[in-house]
A protein has these predicted regions:
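A short acidic Gly-Thr/Ser loop motif
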Residues: 68-69, 99
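ATP/NTP phosphate-donor binding region
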Residues: 1-67, 74, 78, 115-116
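Catalytic core of DAGKc-family lipid kinases
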Residues: 34, 58, 81-166
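Catalytic cores of large soluble enzymes that bind and process phosphate-bearing ligands
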Residues: 19, 41, 68, 109, ...
């Protein structure tokens, strides 16, 4: 398969307790084998994926791929939607599951095995998805979500879990 589209792979090297960073050579080999035109960039700090997704959108990439877990996907969605709000054309979102939490990929039917995920990405199958936005609390400017949002007890558990050492 060859594809003339441009893919920006936003990879969180700390996803999956570092397994995402170790998977870079395999990802590169698989995407090359499928003939994809891609660039991989690694996140370096929290919310960097959102910044990289915004830039990839303004740079004109056709597909922006979140390579990580649910956190990387969420940040990437937020960056894409921010770029759309600024008047940019929205690229397609791709996901490579290399994190610990892959609920978004699971709910979308995206394979969580890396080779199958790369094959799915190369197949160029697309569908529209709903994106929600929550405004308030810690996010007065709003924050987007792709597969779920927690409020009340669920949100407290999420914030407390962030404090735990992994």
């Amino acid at each position: 398969m060859t594809d003339n589209q441009s893919y920006k792979i936003i990879l969180n090297p700390t996803s999956g307790r570092g397994s995402a960073g170790r998977a870079v050579p395999q990802i590169e080999n698989l995407l090359r084998a499928y003939g994809l035109n891609f660039e991989i960039v690694k996140t370096e700090y929290p919310w960097h994926a959102a910044e990289l997704a915004r830039k990839a959108t303004t740079d004109g990439f056709d597909v922006v791929v979140a390579a990580g877990g649910d956190g990387t996907v969420n940040e990437t969605i937020n960056g894409l939607m921010d770029a759309k709000e600024a008047g940019n054309l929205l690229p397609a979102l791709g996901v490579l599951s290399v994190g610990r939490g892959n609920d978004f990929a699971f709910s979308m039917g995206i394979p969580t095995e890396l080779e199958a995920g790369c094959k799915t990405l190369a197949s160029n199958q697309r569908r529209c998805i709903d994106i929600g936005r929550v405004v308030g609390g810690l996010y007065p400017q709003g924050r987007y979500f792709g597969n779920g949002v927690g409020i009340g007890f669920d949100a407290v558990v999420g914030f407390e879990a962030l404090k735990l050492k992994r």
